Amino acid sequence: MEIGVFIPIGNNGWLLSENAPQYKPSFELNKEITLKAEKYGFDFVLSMIKLRGFGGKTEFWDHNLESFTLMSGLAAVTTRIKLFATAATLVMPPAIVARMASTIDSISNGRFGLNLVTGWQRPEYSQMGMWPGDEYFAKRYDYLGEYATVLRDLWETGKSDLKGEFFQMDDCRLSPRPQADMKVICAGSSTAGMEFSAQYADYNFCFGVGVNTPKAFAPAAERLQVATAKTGRDVSSFVLFMVIADETDEAARAKWESYKDGADQEAIAWLGVQGAADTKSGSDTNIRQMADSVSAVNINMGTLVGSYETIAKLLDEVPTVPGTGGVLLTFDDFVKGVEDFGTKIQPLMKCREHIKPMLEAAE
């Protein structure tokens, strides 16, 4: 099973809580996290894109770096780990993104891939006059399908002449093309999102579900397998979890309870309002899960809480779900979390025994 880190490109990571660590994003912070991840054999890191935050007392995600420029910097200081940037496709033309990706492919010597998002938070785009109207919610994966087609045309052939509803290419050219196969990620959970991933993506990210229920995402993985059976493509599910670990189960649980007690209700309310704005896509979108009141303090991602031994056992259950390729991890404290994972959790994981020779050779 592959393991990646969802690096904190926005302030405070993924905890909307006054009791959680408070910090601003920086290149140095993300470099430290990424170099630790590379040292301990993590397979990849991914950064999101967020153009407007949720406010509140913690100013949640009001402070964000830009994904491509961050990953280009990380590409220059790493040697092995794979790097994924996120394209805000509503404001970044596909031909430009294709060239940016090819450039980072050159910097990283073939270690770069791309996460495509449609854009679900209207104020991110309306603030700069680039929101296409709420009818976009119903067409966003049609838009993304054309977008991905242009990318693939340019990366694979160096040319695109796509004439679609959203994009009109006229002998559009790209050179140099990427030296490595450019992997594409999507995080679709709706029916339309799953169908997009089955047709265009190499990996589909889905949310873990609940607390210490590492296999509860299985229905999402099964839906993806049904979708890929229709396209005949091999697309793996990668699952998003937050790890809150400590020496004992009790100590880890105390941290989790404290984070919930300090929930930033103003920021959570903003998330709920934005989640309700999409009335076109149905009830199975990621944003609907993120805004659910059950655990909005960490946007309702699957949460693993416990001792280092407990976390290792829980993560070993994940790859037993058919169609699972890996996990994408966040931490309450990223620097300490990645260090503890590399030294105290991963060595106990049966599904990570294959990396031990690599780590021993690097010592």
UniProtKB/Swiss-Prot annotation:
SUPFAM superfamilies: Bacterial luciferase-like
InterPro entries in the record: Luciferase-like_dom, Luciferase-like_sf, Pyrimidine_monooxygenase_RutA, SsuD_RutA_monooxygenase
GO MF annotation, one: uracil oxygenase activity
EC number from the UniProt entry: 1.14.99.46
Keyword tags: Flavoprotein, FMN, Monooxygenase, NADP, Oxidoreductase
EC top class named in words: oxidoreductase
Source taxon at top rank: Bacteria
Binding site for FMN: 49-50, 115, 124, 140-141, 190
Catalytic activity: uracil + FMNH2 + NADH + O2 = (Z)-3-ureidoacrylate + FMN + NAD(+) + H2O + H(+); thymine + FMNH2 + NADH + O2 = (Z)-2-methylureidoacrylate + FMN + NAD(+) + H2O + H(+)
One GO BP annotation of this record: nitrogen utilization
Pfam family, one: Bac_luciferase
Protein family according to the UniProt entry: Belongs to the NtaA/SnaA/DszA monooxygenase family. RutA subfamily.
PANTHER family per the UniProt record, alphabetical: ALKANESULFONATE MONOOXYGENASE, ALKANESULFONATE MONOOXYGENASE-RELATED
HAMAP family documented for this protein: RutA
Functional description taken from the UniProt entry: The FMN-N(5)-oxide reacts spontaneously with NADH to produce FMN. Requires the flavin reductase RutF to regenerate FMN in vivo.
Name of this chain's protein: Pyrimidine monooxygenase RutA
Protein source organism: Rhizobium rhizogenes (strain K84 / ATCC BAA-868) (Agrobacterium radiobacter)
Upper lineage: Bacteria, Pseudomonadati, Pseudomonadota, Alphaproteobacteria, Hyphomicrobiales
Gene name as annotated: rutA
